[in-house]
Structure formats: C-alpha cells, structure tokens
C-alpha cells in the first residue's frame, strides 16, 4: 500500500514521534519463546487489536478482521484499543467485541492515563494481540506493551519491535481492510490468496435500526421511492467543488429519473449542495448508517462516511481524486470505486450510473 495522501511520514514532528515510539517498543514484543508459525488454532480466547486511529473510516476497516476472528476463534472476546471516540458506537453491533479502550488523543501528553491503561492491558493477560496496520509504529508499540502470549502483524522496514508471528506484507494486496485478515490467515499457517474472499466491512445493524432508518428515509422523500444518497463532503484534496457536484448530479438524475436524491449532511450540519435536496443529519454514526442502509445508491468522495455506507450494506460508489484506490476502495457486491482524477464530472456520473443501473 502506498502512503499517498493519508500517510505522510516526512514531517519533523512525525520523525520525532517515530523515534519515541521505537524507544517505547524496544524489546517488548510478547512471549519471545513462542514458536514462529503457525499460530495455534485453539486455546486463544482473549484478543486485543491495537489501532491508534482517530478516524471513523479506519475504525470501520477493522470490521473485516473482527469477522475473520469471529470465524476462526468463535469463543473468543476481542478488545479494541483506539483513539476514535466513535469506536464504541461503531462496534456496538459486534457480539465478539468486549471492551473498546479509548486512548487519550495526545498519548504522550497524558503519561498518567497511558500508564494506567497499559497496566490494565498487561493485567488482562491477552492470548493474542494484533497490529493491523502496515504503517503505524504506535500500533506496534502498543502490541508490544500488552505482553500478550502471541502477537501478529505485518512486517516492514518501517516497523520497529518484534512479534511472535510477523508476516511479510504481500506484494499483490494493498487494501487496509484486507491486510490484517491476510496476516492472521498467514500466521495460522495458511498461504492466503490475495484474490480470495475477504470479509466485508460490517456495521452489524439490527433489524430495529434498519427499520427506523427506513422510516426516517420515507419521512424525507414522501411516497415510497427509490433513493440516491449523496455525501458531498471530504477533507482537503479529496474533496470536490460545488460546481463539480452540480454537473455530476445533473447527469446522475437524468439517468435515474424515478429516484429521489437525498443529501447526507457533514458534521457541520450545513448543506454543501445549496439545499437543493431533502437532507439528513445525524451526529450518531449508527443512526446515519441505519438510514444509509435503506438507500438504493450512495455516492461520496473518499471519506469515513463512504466506508460507513459500505459497512451498512448500501450500494456504494466511492469517488477518488487523490487517495490510493487500491488501499482504500470500497469492495464487495454492489460497491464500486471510481478514479475521478482529471475526469469531467459528467463522465464519472455516467460511469457510476452504468455500474449501478437499477433500470
């Protein structure tokens, strides 16, 4: 996976933080007497995933790993260590998730809180700790400090600290949601194929949540109509201008004349499309996901809400203008990613309409 857009590693601040993390993880990598491969398929019941991300999207990208763990270790409980404040709600539907431990936003600025948290991790006596991300030394350091019996993660020259089951990153697989699943399968002694089936992102919405979302959507659109949801917000260079969206939606609406269009509002609560369409706002990701799950098509740029839509099960079109598509695309049935770099909006709209043509 490239480090495009989301993973600039060249700033002096990040270099200093990387050196601190390397010191933090020195020589602390779990039980060094454990065998290299394979990881035992039984006797593992307490599992820790360390992912020090703050974002909604990267938290949802852990759900394929949760699905793989659920299948491989059906009697296990998984704790998640994260900086994402929304993680407890995002993962609330997963029966195998026990505790979601929230790291302080500035970990090195809260030494007392961190010391207390790390003591708790060591006291939990985890059987397995997983470092799920290829480019984070912080995740590796947290795995090391957990002192779990076994530790699994992808290995690269960017990583510091040993694991009992370090897995070389594959050359032909880059997706951030699939890579930790690959690592676990490889640690179990398998030779996974990059083209094999991987669990999808999954919000695990309940029937009651979906029904409430359907009612909210019906309230917005009036009579029962097929509906397209549009989320026009993305950060920085991943965003599209208002004029771009206007041209895109003219073509999309013409291709789907029987569909209503609903705007999904960003955290600011303001329309980015000039209040031309009925709009829905929620500060609660599961409530938002419940409504999106009832859409016939969801369209957005590359962002966390794109992954939320995919995890809700909605047909999802992700529009990429800057990020690495191979590393962050939406995958699975009724999901598609489109490279919009340098392409006119009308052409991208036509591609989306052709891919998701509902007749």
At which residue positions do the language-model features occur?
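Catalytic machinery of carbohydrate-active enzymes
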Residues: 1-359
């Amino acid at each position: 996976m490239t480090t495009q857009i989301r993973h600039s590693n060249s700033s002096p601040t990040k270099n200093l933080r990387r050196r601190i993390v390397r010191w933090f993880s020195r020589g602390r990598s779990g039980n060094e007497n454990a065998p290299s491969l394979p990881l035992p398929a039984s006797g593992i019941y307490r599992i820790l995933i360390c992912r020090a991300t703050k974002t909604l999207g990267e938290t949802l990208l852990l759900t394929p790993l949760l699905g793989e763990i659920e299948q491989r270790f059906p009697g296990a409980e998984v704790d998640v260590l994260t900086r994402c404040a929304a993680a407890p709600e995002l993962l609330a539907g997963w029966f195998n998730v026990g505790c979601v431990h929230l790291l302080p936003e500035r970990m090195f600025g809260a030494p007392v809180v961190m010391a207390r948290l790390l003591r708790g991790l060591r006291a939990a006596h985890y059987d397995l700790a997983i470092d799920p991300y290829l480019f984070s030394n912080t995740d590796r350091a947290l795995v090391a400090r957990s002192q779990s019996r076994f530790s699994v993660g992808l290995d690269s020259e960017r990583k510091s600290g040993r694991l009992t089951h370090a897995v070389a990153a594959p050359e032909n697989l880059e997706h951030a949601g699939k890579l930790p699943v690959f690592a676990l399968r490889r640690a179990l002694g398998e030779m996974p194929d990059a083209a094999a089936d991987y669990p999808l992102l999954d919000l695990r919405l309940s029937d009651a949540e979906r029904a409430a979302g359907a009612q909210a959507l019906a309230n917005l659109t009036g009579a029962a109509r097929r509906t397209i949801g549009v989320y026009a917000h993305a950060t920085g260079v991943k965003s599209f201008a208002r004029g771009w969206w206007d041209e895109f939606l003219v073509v999309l609406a013409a291709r789907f004349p029987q569909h209503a269009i609903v705007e999904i509002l960003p955290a600011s609560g303001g329309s980015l499309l000039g209040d031309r369409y009925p709009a829905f706002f929620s500060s609660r990701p599961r409530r938002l996901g419940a409504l999106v799950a009832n859409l016939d098509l969801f369209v957005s740029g590359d962002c966390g809400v794109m992954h939320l839509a995919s995890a809700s099960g909605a047909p999802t079109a992700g529009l990429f203008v800057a990020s690495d598509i191979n590393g962050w695309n939406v995958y699975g049935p009724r999901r598609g990613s489109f490279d919009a770099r340098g392409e006119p909006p009308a052409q991208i709209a036509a591609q989306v309409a052709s891919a998701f043509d509902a007749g």
